[in-house]
From Swiss-Prot:
Protein name: Ixosin
Superkingdom as given in the UniProt entry: Eukaryota
Biological-process GO terms, alphabetical: defense response to fungus; defense response to Gram-negative bacterium; defense response to Gram-positive bacterium; killing of cells of another organism
Entry keywords, A to Z: Antibiotic, Antimicrobial, Fungicide
Cleaved propeptide residues: 1-56
Function per UniProt: Has antifungal activity against C.albicans. Has antibacterial activity against the Gram-positive bacterium S.aureus and the Gram-negative bacterium E.coli. Lacks hemolytic activity against rabbit erythrocytes.
UniProt organism field: Ixodes sinensis (Hard tick)
Length: 79
């Protein structure tokens, strides 16, 4: 039984969050399909840059795990 992983890495000024299993369940966040996003360190994040099937699930991960506010696309930070 393989573990579910959420990888957070910093590369070339961008944060990449990769959900690497067909479905991911994080405690308190529910489950959602796999996908990946690249969050720019500066500028804004457009909805069409998000390649995750369940965007609500993604926003929960961004907010709860990463400390990224859904309505504040101007800044990204790790809590």
């Amino acid at each position: 039984m393989s573990a579910h992983k959420v990888q957070i890495g910093l590369s070339s000024g961008q944060f990449r969050v990769a959900l690497q299993v067909p479905s991911v369940r994080l405690k308190g966040l529910g489950s959602f399909h796999t996908g990946s996003i690249v969050l720019p360190s500066q500028g804004s994040l457009r909805e069409d840059q998000i390649s995750l099937h369940n965007q609500d699930g993604l926003h929960k991960v961004m907010r709860e795990v990463l400390g990224y506010e859904r309505n504040s696309y101007k800044k990204f930070f790790l809590r």
